[in-house]
From Swiss-Prot:
Belongs to the prokaryotic molybdopterin-containing oxidoreductase family. NasA/NapA/NarB subfamily. This is Periplasmic nitrate reductase. The gene is napA. The keyword Metal-binding applies. [4Fe-4S] cluster binds at residues 45, 48, 52, 80. Keywords: 4Fe-4S, Electron transport, Iron, Iron-sulfur, Metal-binding, Molybdenum, Nitrate assimilation, Oxidoreductase, Periplasm, Signal, Transport.
Length: 828
């Protein structure tokens, strides 16, 4: 399809008006007459984890247009407001185009001015700092904080560079802040990660329950599908649970506002209701589940010196699960009566009972969706377990229109962070560094000698901040994220370590973000279709795209940076002498040679039959790097329930949902007739465990790490708005998006405002025990908060909401709780 740039701008005007109003519309409703000026190709959207496919229009070496891909199953030609403005994210006036090092008089100076340097100069000082830190502080002396926005190829390269080449597992993604609890609970419940269902469930479900998920703004294309299902089928029901009222409530038949943290009590009440009313599937439970009891009083992931950690009894065994049975489970949930759930949550009894009846109805196909409200939670793993319990008790799982569905917030939090394994403890395809057999397999598939990959887990995201501050770690490379703005407790735990004289911080980014400006070295990065890439979305769908334009100036893709940087190290410098003595063929080689010129990664050449094909990495390195990385990686999962198709298939398709066996994708896992790994006659097989049974886990309600008191008398919860994505690095550089929502706000109940002598629009100071932020008050807008709670966002670099947040984490998953801390608000 072809569309002129002028006509595209007309299209955008109509689209913007509709999207700001909360609509998602297909391009065919607004497009003008076609011509042959613009070249079109497909790519997945750069933003959330939905995985919409867009058609990208290029002209004269620039991206000038985009539109929803009508051939894509996910979005069916629709885009949300952010998707329609994708071309503009790449052309901000302050785009970085050369490496920048802090220097004074031609030498590195921690307090110097950012000065352009060559890539060789940048990598030389980086290598020097890495070698020194790893030698002096051990494998965790240097590390990387990376992203669920990195491509699959970039994830493979960084995992190999750190875990194999540098022999450091000290690499963790920002997905630790958003998806770790979901991933851990998947692994603990089913023995395998990621959802069993897919987006096709939406058109087959009779009821939807949203737990801590504002899909109307955060996953608007999926919300459009739910809206269509609800509005075209009168009997379909929607329940929305949250700590405040947001736009998703507009469609809700049952809108539930609960006290922060009390979702744990509500879910235990539902489980108790199901048992008391014999609304459970006894046959399913007997055949396909087993019972465990979780450890309790496990702390809050704070520093060991914190009073809450010292008081907790089971911090060291937080993840332990004890054998149990149905009778003990029944006894443990019995205290969660309607009265107790109401008392803890503040939810009216009739609403609680109505919700329980939705799950109890055997005729109702039901899907539970959740996002950060569940995961960014000091008991996030428990919350995920508790929703699985409900679906397992009723047998409403792993079949069309029925199941628990964890939605991801980033385009490849699944495909890269989880599947590739860029967490500090993971390897590809659900393998972990602490399992010697898994390590042995990784060494074999990566053609490495035994003993190269270490079994010591690296620092998780929050621990990296603490280690840098405490000087246990001296080098940090941040890639494809903005943690100085997006991570918790900036004042006390992050900024001090970044600016410490002994530490060296590198940031790879296309723009001068808050993180970049706090770093010592900035590396300019290619964006989106300036490189060839691949993402994996929330429904296990892997999608590829080709490079379509070149990056500006000296900007390089992250995969180029990682692979080129590997040339600055030798095995003699980084690997143990005994390993090299036993394997002399590796001695004296660069990490580039052993990791990326190993006869596997470098065995493919770029296609010669594709007119206009470009691949800057292949041109530089002399081989088809992306294909080599992917095919080497894909071997990890083939035959083990993580099967991926071959490389070329993905470039032809609009994505495929794994496992892909004999060329066929899998829509519903663990169910006979849909999943090729479930044998005939098994019906359901949760084959992540040898006994093929899923775990139902008994865990209680426990209070949050911090709650309001006389001084800090309000709950604070943080999140996003429709128009902006995460820290606004891209969306705030789109003029239309910036104008539609220029600055952050603090939403407050009108009575709370009146009590403080405040009015809508007032300039206010919001303070916590950790810091403060100046903003403006909103008592009338889209978010309607209950008394006692305020809501704010983190997209605005001029208002750093994470000055306020607490760095408490789930003790099992190590995921941060951005949803609950105590603040006070006063006139500024």
């Amino acid at each position: 399809m072809n569309l002129s740039r002028r006509d595209f701008m007309k299209t955008n005007a109509a689209v913007a008006a509709a999207a700001v109003a909360g609509l998602a519309i297909p391009v065919k409703n607004v497009e003008a007459s076609p011509d042959k000026i613009i070249k079109w190709d497909k790519a997945p959207c750069r933003f959330c984890g939905t995985g919409c496919s867009v058609l990208v229009g290029t002209q004269n070496g620039r991206v000038v247009a985009s539109q929803g891909d009508p051939d894509a199953d996910v979005n069916r030609g629709l885009n949300c407001i952010k998707g329609y403005f994708l071309p503009k994210i790449m052309y901000g006036k302050d785009r970085l185009t050369s490496p920048m090092l802090r220097m004074t008089n031609g030498k590195f100076d921690k307090h110097g001015e950012f000065t352009p340097v060559s890539w060789d100069q940048a990598f030389t000082i980086m290598a020097e700092k890495f070698k020194k830190a790893l030698k002096e502080k051990g494998p965790n002396g240097a590390g990387m904080f990376t992203s669920g926005q990195s491509t699959i190829f970039e994830g493979i390269a960084k995992s190999k560079l750190f875990k194999a080449g540098l022999r450091s597992n000290n690499i963790d993604p920002n997905a630790r802040h958003c998806m770790a609890s979901a991933a851990v609970a998947f692994m603990r419940t089913f023995g395998m990660d990621e959802p069993m269902g897919c987006y096709d469930d939406i058109e087959k479900a009779d009821a939807f329950v949203l737990w801590g998920s504002n899909m109307a703004e955060m996953h608007p294309i999926l919300w459009s599908r739910i809206s269509d299902r609800r509005l075209s089928h009168p009997d379909v029901k929607v329940a929305v649970l949250s700590t405040f009222e947001h736009r998703s409530f507009e469609l809700a038949d049952l809108g539930v506002i609960f006290t922060p943290q009390s979702d744990l009590a509500i879910m235990n009440y539902i489980a108790n209701y199901l048992i008391q009313h014999d609304a459970i599937d006894h046959d399913f439970i007997q055949k396909h589940t087993k019972f465990k009891r979780g450890e309790t009083d496990i702390g809050y992931g704070l520093r060991e010196t914190h009073e809450l950690e010292k008081a907790a009894k089971n911090v060291k065994t937080a993840g332990k699960m004890h054998d149990s049975d149905f009778e003990e489970y029944k006894k443990l949930v019995a205290p969660y009566t309607l009265e107790k759930a109401h008392e803890i949550s503040g939810v009216p009894k009739e609403q609680l009972e109505a919700l329980a009846k939705m799950y109890a109805d055997p005729k109702l196909n039901i899907v539970s969706f959740w996002t950060m409200g569940f995961n960014q939670h000091t008991r996030g793993v428990w919350a995920n377990h508790l929703i699985y319990n409900i679906h397992l008790l009723t047998g409403k799982i792993s079949k069309p229109g029925c199941g628990p569905f964890s939605l991801t917030g980033q385009p490849s939090a699944c495909g890269t962070a989880r599947e590739v394994g860029t967490f500090a403890h993971r390897l590809p395809a659900d393998l972990v560094v602490t399992n010697p057999k898994h390590v042995e397999k990784a060494e074999k598939l990566w053609k490495l000698p035994k003993g190269v990959i270490q079994t010591q887990v690296g620092y998780h995201a929050v621990a990296q901040d603490r280690a840098l501050k405490d000087k246990k770690m001296n080098v940090l490379w941040q890639m494809c994220t903005n943690n100085m703005q997006g991570g918790p407790n900036i004042n006390q735990e992050r900024f001090p370590g970044w600016r410490d004289e002994e530490n060296f911080v590198i940031v790879s980014d296309p723009y001068p973000t808050v993180s970049a400006l706090a770093a010592d070295l900035i590396l300019p990065t290619a964006m989106w279709v300036e490189k060839e890439g691949a993402y994996g979305n929330a429904e296990r769908r892997t999608q590829f795209w080709y490079q379509q334009v070149k990056a500006p100036g000296e900007s390089k893709s992250d995969v180029w940076q990682l692979v080129e940087f590997s040339k600055y190290f030798t095995t003699d410098e980084m690997w143990p002498a005994e390993v090299l003595a036993a394997n002399p063929e590796y001695k004296g080689k660069t990490l580039y040679e052993v990791l990326f010129r190993n006869g596997q990664v470098d065995k493919f050449q770029v296609p010669t039959d594709k007119p206009g094909y470009m691949n800057d990495e292949a041109e530089h390195f002399g081989f088809y790097l992306q294909k080599g990385l992917f095919e080497e990686y894909a071997v990890f999962g083939r035959g083990h329930g993580h099967d991926l198709a071959d490389f070329e298939t993905y470039h032809k398709a609009r994505g495929l949902r794994w496992p892909v066996v004999d060329g066929k994708e899998t829509l519903w896992r663990y169910r006979e007739g849909y999943d090729p790994y479930v044998k005939e006659g098994e019906g359901v097989a949760f084959y992540g465990y040898p006994d093929k049974k899923a775990i139902i886990l008994a865990v209680p309600y426990e209070p949050p790490a911090e709650a309001p008191n006389a001084e800090y008398d309000l709950w604070l919860t943080t999140g996003r708005v429709l128009e902006h994505w995460h820290t606004g690095t891209m969306t705030r550089r789109v003029p239309e998006l910036h104008r539609s929502f220029p600055n952050n706000l603090v939403w407050m109940h009108p009575l709370d405002a009146k009590k403080r002598g405040l009015r809508h629009g007032d300039k206010v100071k919001i303070s916590s025990r950790r810091g403060e932020m100046i903003s403006h008050l909103d008592t009338r807008g889209r978010n309607k908060v209950p008394q006692g709670l305020v809501y704010t966002t983190f997209f605005d670099a001029g208002q750093l909401a994470n000055y306020l947040t607490l760095d408490a984490t789930d003790p099992i998953s190590k995921e941060t709780d951005f949803k609950k801390c105590a603040v006070k608000v006063e006139k500024a």
